[in-house]
């Protein structure tokens, strides 16, 4: 490891297993307002704000279950939005779904992407002038 403030490595991108990478790339590009920079049957990639997310085809892919008491959830993305209800409605219109179990008590919202993987919506922090 480097000295305090220095890093040994830099994150270049995140890759996520998927049943249908092209579909997931289209979904997240629309959800985030990013660009699909690569897409075929085995891999999809989106990019925006200097961040890349890749989606790789995994035969027999099974998404995490939500809620999952067994702890099989592998990861989740947190997306900040201006309005939870409006964002959830917009994302469901392009392929997300909203499970019944919502642990956030209105502080955040859990949705499932088109592959069934959970992700969360949380309010964008207020900025002070």
Task: Provide a role label for each language-model segment.
Residues 47, 52-70, 75-80, 106, ...:
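Conserved, structured core segments of small domains
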Residues 46-49, 111-114, 124:
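Active-site beta-strand termini and strand-to-loop segments that position acidic
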Residues 1-25, 74-81, 122-129:
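N-terminal beta-strand motif that seeds the catalytic metal site of vicinal oxygen chelate
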Residues 57, 101-102, 121-128:
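Short beta->alpha transition motifs characteristic of CBS
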Residues 69-72, 93-97:
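Short intrinsically disordered coil segments
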Residues 8-59, 86-89, 93, 99-101, ...:
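Core segments of cupin and vicinal oxygen chelate
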């Amino acid at each position: 490891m480097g000295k305090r403030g220095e890093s040994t490595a830099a994150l270049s991108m995140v890759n996520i297993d998927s049943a249908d990478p092209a579909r997931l790339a289209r979904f997240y590009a629309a959800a985030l307002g990013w660009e699909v920079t690569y897409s075929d049957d085995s891999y999809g990639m989106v990019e925006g704000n200097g961040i890349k997310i890749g989606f790789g085809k995994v035969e027999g892919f099974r998404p995490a279950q939500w809620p999952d008491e067994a702890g099989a959830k592998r990861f989740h993305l947190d997306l900040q939005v201006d309005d939870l209800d409006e964002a959830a409605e917009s994302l469901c219109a392009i392929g997300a779904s909203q499970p019944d179990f919502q642990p956030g008590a209105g502080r955040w919202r859990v949705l499932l992407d088109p592959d069934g993987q959970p992700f969360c919506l949380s309010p964008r922090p207020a900025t002070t002038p």
